[in-house]
Amino acid sequence: YGSFGVFGNHDVTERLLGGFSVASQAKEMRDPRFDEFAKKAKIRILDDEVMLIDDAFYLVGRKDAQKPGDGTKNRIEPEVILSGLDKAKPIIVLEHQPKQLKELETSGADMQLCGHTHDGQMFPGNLTVKLMWENACGYLKKGNLHSIVTSGVGVWGPAMRVGTDCEICPITIHFQG
């Protein structure tokens, strides 16, 4: 089927100071090097797109909530992007930030796969991140939605982690019924 992905909030051209992004622009554009990398790596980016895979399940990729990277602040809402899908088939949502869990669940999504939080990256962020996100890292079941958030391998700001681990999270999915 291939490799699929979504862009995140730091995949735009932005000014950095000490590794931290500063002076956020209203209409940030995706850095073209990310598109080139994805193409060379044969990663299909789903940018507010839905794919039906092997007539068996849906893969939905959402634009980043904070910085879509296309010069807008818009992305398609869960109830719109999931409308018209056959809800008898599993619906897996790829999204950089673990947002809108309730909306995804009520719109029929079965699973949401995310990153973004770095699990706080360093102390005390590894403690406070849990106040900001319903699922800051790990697994959470909300109604019929399974939310999985990985701490990832990247960093934001200083190139270090304290109190969190880098991870690539293999997931095995078994469809029933």
Ranges and model annotations:
Residues Y1-G177:
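Soluble catalytic domains of enzymes that build or remodel membrane lipids, polysaccharides, and related
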